[in-house]
Each structure stands twice: as C-alpha cells, then as structure tokens.
UniProtKB/Swiss-Prot annotation:
Main location: plastid
Keywords: ATP synthesis, CF(0), Chloroplast, Hydrogen ion transport, Ion transport, Membrane, Plastid, Thylakoid, Transmembrane, Transmembrane helix, Transport
Any one Pfam family match given in the protein's UniProt record, by short name: ATP-synt_A
GO molecular function: proton-transporting ATP synthase activity, rotational mechanism
Complexes and interactors: F-type ATPases have 2 components, CF(1) - the catalytic core - and CF(0) - the membrane proton channel. CF(1) has five subunits: alpha(3), beta(3), gamma(1), delta(1), epsilon(1). CF(0) has four main subunits: a, b, b' and c.
Keyword Ion transport attributed: yes
Protein name, per record: ATP synthase subunit a, chloroplastic
UniProt subcellular location: Plastid, Chloroplast thylakoid membrane
Residues spanning the membrane: 3-23, 38-58, 99-119, 138-158, 203-223, 224-244
Membrane-protein topology: Multi-pass membrane protein
Gene Ontology CC entries for this record: chloroplast thylakoid membrane; plasma membrane; proton-transporting ATP synthase complex
Function in brief: Key component of the proton channel; it plays a direct role in the translocation of protons across the membrane.
Lineage, top ranks: Eukaryota, Discoba, Euglenozoa, Euglenida, Spirocuta
Superkingdom to which the source organism belongs: Eukaryota
Native species: Euglena gracilis
C-alpha cells in the first residue's frame, strides 16, 4: 500500500513538473481599434470588475434606512474605512473631495486582485492568452499610477498655483534634479509594486497547483487574498499621501 501511494505522489509530482511548461506569462489577446493594438483581455477583465463594483454599490445602497440592515452596515463600514484613509493621509481640511478618488482606486484594485483568485477565468477561452486579474498586467498598474501622478499634480497646482513648483528648489536648489526624479519614481514604484506582487502570487499558485493540486495551494490562495487586500490598501494609502504632500509641500 505504501509503495502504491509513493508511486502515485511521485507520478503526480513528475507530471506536474511537465505541466509547468504550460503556465503562460505575457500572452495577450489583442484588439485592433483605430490602428492601435489594445490588450483585449485587460479591457474585458476591467469591465467585469467595474460591473461587480457597480452591482454591489447599487445593491448595498438600495432602500437605505435609519436603522441599517446587514448590507447597509457593510457599505457604511467600507465608506468609513475609505474616509479614514483619506482623512489620515490628506488632512481634515482637504480630504472630503478626494474620498471618491481614493475609494475608486482602493475598490478597483481590491476587487481586481481578488477576482484573480476567486473567479474561474480559465473556463473562458480566448484565441490567445487568458483572462485573469486586471492588475497582473503592467499596463493596468502603470495607468493607475499615472492617474495618481496627475491627481497629485492637480492637487498641488489647484491649491498653490504656480508657486507649487517652488518645492523643486527647496530647501536648496542643489536638490532640483533629485526632486524632479522623485516625481518619476513615485509612479514607477506604485505600478511595479502592485504588478509584481499580483503576478508573482498568481504564478506561484499556478505552479503549485500543477505540482500538488490537492493540499498545498489552498492556504496559499488564502494568503494571496490577504496579500491582495494589503496591496490595494498600500496603493490607496500612498496615493492619498502623495496628494496630501502636494498640497502641504512636505517631503
């Protein structure tokens, strides 16, 4: 009996090693729109995530009452959580108008990350590549990071006008190149941190599912869900921090 079990696990392990070659990285399904090549699966994934967020938002805010029910309690907790992030990072005077932006970033990234682990994307076949979390594509994370860059530039210019650019020569003009470089490294760090963590998590789970499909991947999936939530929180927190920094002028 022991020999049979040993043979079974060895055979499963060897078969899994050969299946690892089927784990695709960087495969894309392209759409050609007005002469531009667009990642079709990213658009599909993103719209699915947006529809999920939209449905949950409508469902949980329908028929609001003074004494909240379960679904209303849930959406109030989410709103309070996002509001606290914005208030902490941006400040009590300016945070209110940035709650929608911070909330949009957090919810989109959070649902995108979780969708990669919870939605069985592989049942939907594409001519090339496969569906998955939108945030496992560098184009998505780079786009979100660029939006945050535009947001904190707008926040600084809107509050300070052209005097906003004084920060580049403070406390001394010698730091001008470093201060300019900082504005390029912020979106880079935001995009690559999110992309790297989500892609690595999905690849590790895919490889382990091929090697040991029954036991090992389950706790890793739960760990991945926790990590995905943390990454959404980090992105939203840093976005709020950069916006608050732009308005206050602190480094």
């Amino acid at each position: 009996m022991k020999i049979v079990l040993l043979y079974y696990f060895v055979n499963m392990f060897i078969s899994g090693i050969f299946q690892i070659a089927n784990v695709e990285v960087g495969q894309h399904f392209y759409w050609s729109i007005l002469g531009f090549q667009i990642h079709g699966q990213v658009l599909i994934n993103s719209w699915i995530v947006i529809l999920i967020i939209g449905f949950l938002s409508i469902y949980t805010t329908k028929n609001l009452t003074l004494v909240p029910a379960n679904k209303q309690i849930f959406i109030e907790l989410v709103t309070e959580f996002i509001t606290d992030i914005s208030k902490t990072q941006i400040g009590e005077k300016e945070y209110s108008k940035w709650v929608p932006y911070i909330g949009t970033m957090f919810l989109f990234i959070f649902v995108s990350n979780w969708s990669g682990a919870l939605i069985p994307w592989k049942i939907i076949e594409l001519p090339n590549g496969e569906l998955g979390a939108p945030t496992n594509d560098i184009n998505t994370t780079a786009g979100l990071a660029i939006l945050t860059s535009l947001a904190y530039f707008y926040a600084g210019l809107n509050k300070k006008g052209l005097t906003y650019f004084k920060k580049y020569v403070q406390p001394t003009p010698i730091l001008l190149p470093i201060n300019i470089l900082e504005d390029f490294t912020k979106p880079l760090s935001l995009s690559f941190r999110l992309f790297g963590n989500i892609l690595a998590d999905e690849l590790v789970v895919a490889v382990l599912v091929s090697l040991v499909p029954l036991i090992v991947p389950v706790p890793l999936i739960f760990l991945g869900l926790f990590t995905s939530g943390i990454q959404a929180l980090i992105f939203a927190t840093l976005s709020g921090s950069y916006i608050g920094e732009a308005m206050e002028g602190h480094h």
